[in-house]
From Swiss-Prot:
Species this chain originates from: Schizosaccharomyces pombe (strain 972 / ATCC 24843) (Fission yeast)
Superkingdom classification of source: Eukaryota
InterPro entries: Mpv17_PMP22
Protein name: Uncharacterized protein C4G9.14
Membrane-traversing stretches: 2-22, 34-54, 97-117, 131-151, 177-197
Subcellular location per the Swiss-Prot or TrEMBL entry: Membrane
Length: 221
């Protein structure tokens, strides 16, 4: 019950923080665009991690009710943590920091795509932007996420390398299931100034997925 209450309180705080900035977006954006986008993105990534923690806690409690100590997964025995009643605040802060740090990179990338790729046929320009985004930014973005989390969690080089080797390609494949369609819509219908916000709103689901993968009991990190 404590984990549920903690996560609900955390979600409410992040939601209020997010909508506070949304309500003042235009004024804040004109004064400090990158900081405004960064704080919005930080609140969204924090929400994503809280969602992931809630799902993770629910799964562990569900399995613990069926089996007291361990569960069988992919042919291996995985020991469950002694308790799931504690909200990992430091983990949520790490994800908020990740969102804040990613924003200026993401924003400048979208601006560069818009400025560099200009053709007489708008559809071709959009397709080229999506292609560059998915074949350049997406692979590097996943590397940035793994490195950021590994460094902020003080993981050793060997464990980080092992995690890369095990999880990079599956994560990149999962990226290609979701993001090409999202970015096609984003670059077609969303104004440039709002493209980062739209991508980050959709990214709540993606970041929750990454958070679950990064914190899974059998992760080599």
């Amino acid at each position: 019950m404590f984990i549920a209450k903690s996560i609900v309180i955390g979600l409410l705080i992040c939601v209020l923080f997010f909508f506070f900035f949304v309500s003042r977006f235009n004024d804040k954006y004109e004064l400090q665009p990158l900081l405004t986008l960064g704080l919005l993105n930080a609140s969204l990534t924090a929400l994503s991690d809280l969602l992931a923690q809630a799902l993770d806690s629910y799964k562990l409690l569900k399995f613990r009710n069926k089996r007291d100590v361990s569960l069988e997964k992919y042919g291996n025995t995985i020991l469950l943590p002694a308790s799931t009643s504690k909200l990992d605040v430091h983990r949520t802060i790490r994800y908020a920091a990740y969102g804040l740090c990613l924003t200026p990179i993401q924003f400048r990338w979208f601006v560069a795509l818009s400025n560099v790729i200009q053709t007489e046929n708008p559809f071709i320009a959009i397709v080229l932007r999506v292609a560059l985004d998915q074949f350049i930014f997406a692979p590097l973005g996943i590397v940035f996420f793994f490195l950021f989390m590994g460094i902020t969690e003080c993981k050793s080089y060997e464990r980080l390398k092992s995690y890369f080797r095990k999880h990079y390609w599956p994560t990149l494949k999962a990226n290609y299931i979701l993001w090409p369609a999202v970015q096609l819509f984003n670059f077609t219908f969303v104004p440039l100034v709002l493209q980062v916000i739209f991508a980050n709103a959709v990214s709540m689901v993606w970041t929750a997925y990454l958070s679950l993968k990064n914190s899974s009991p059998n992760a080599d990190v």
